[in-house]
Structures are given as structure tokens and as C-alpha cells.
Design a protein with these regions (language model features):
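General helical secondary-structure elements
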Residues: 8, 15, 29-31
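A non-catalytic, amphipathic alpha-helix used as a structural packing/dimerization or gating element
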Residues: 10-24
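Short non-domain terminal segments
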Residues: 3, 16-19, 37
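Glycine-rich flavin
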Residues: 27-137
Length: 137
């Protein structure tokens, strides 16, 4: 048994091609996107093919059903090249799909999770309302 921080066989199988994609597709324009604030919709569509937008969504709802550990490694790999894109993926999974999985009705899960998991829809989360503040706790 390996150490907790070593990549297992499944992780290497997923992360190897994923890292190659990131190096070839995400890295080249990262500095320019950061400078201009351009949102990389083309990369979002390509990342969707790797299942990152449904990484933590169960397969029953169209997701990849990956482990939290593998998902964290995927976000880490994206962040190595593009922090903003990594945050997009992380917030989509934790704040959007995560909250639907946690507190959504079955009807809401069936309506929203397949589109979110496939990358057809990009999740968002609103915190501040006029006149009420921003305390997420």
C-alpha cells in the first residue's frame, strides 16, 4: 500500500492524459486570459469531455462519480496552469452541483444535474442580496 499522497493506478490513468491536455491546451493562453479577463468557453467545453463538471455527481445523474481525492487532484492540475479556470471547475462542483446533491429535491436533481454534469450548463452560486449582507455562515 502506498502513502496517502501517492497517486494510485486509477488516478494515474485519468490524470496522465488530463495533464497532457492541460499542458497543450490550457497553459498556452493562461497568461493572456489572466491579463484580459477573457472567459475560456472553448476550454470549458473541452474540459467537459474529461468529466470534470460532473466529477462528484453520481453516475445515476450523468456524472462521473469520481472520488473527492481524484477530483481534488484534477483541480490541482488545472490550477497549475490556470487558477481562474480551476476555480470555475471547483465552484461549479462544490457550490452548484454540491448543493443540489445535498439539499435538492429528487425533481431538482433530475432536472439540473445531468446538464451540469455534462458541462452543457455551468453552475453558479449567488451569495449577496441587496440589503442583506454576505455572511455565508
Amino acid at each position: 500500500m502506498g502513502l496517502w499522497f501517492e497517486e494510485g493506478a486509477e488516478e494515474r490513468q485519468v490524470l496522465g492524459p488530463f495533464r497532457e491536455f492541460l499542458k497543450a491546451e490550457v497553459a498556452p493562453g493562461a497568461a493572456e486570459r489572466d491579463r484580459t479577463g477573457a472567459f475560456p468557453w472553448d476550454l470549458v467545453r473541452k474540459l467537459a469531455e474529461f468529466g470534470v463538471f460532473g466529477a462528484l455527481v453520481p453516475e445515476a445523474y450523468g456524472g462521473a462519480g469520481l472520488s473527492t481525492r481524484l477530483f481534488a487532484r484534477m483541480v490541482e492540475a488545472i490550477a497549475y496552469y490556470d487558477g481562474a479556470l480551476a476555480l470555475t471547475v471547483a465552484s461549479h462542483n462544490s457550490l452548484a452541483t454540491g448543493h443540489i446533491l445535498l439539499a435538492g429535491s429528487e425533481a431538482q436533481k433530475e432536472a439540473f444535474l445531468p446538464k451540469l454534469a455534462s458541462g452543457e450548463a455551468l453552475g453558479a452560486w449567488g451569495l449577496t442580496e441587496p440589503g442583506s449582507g454576505s455572511d455565508a455562515a
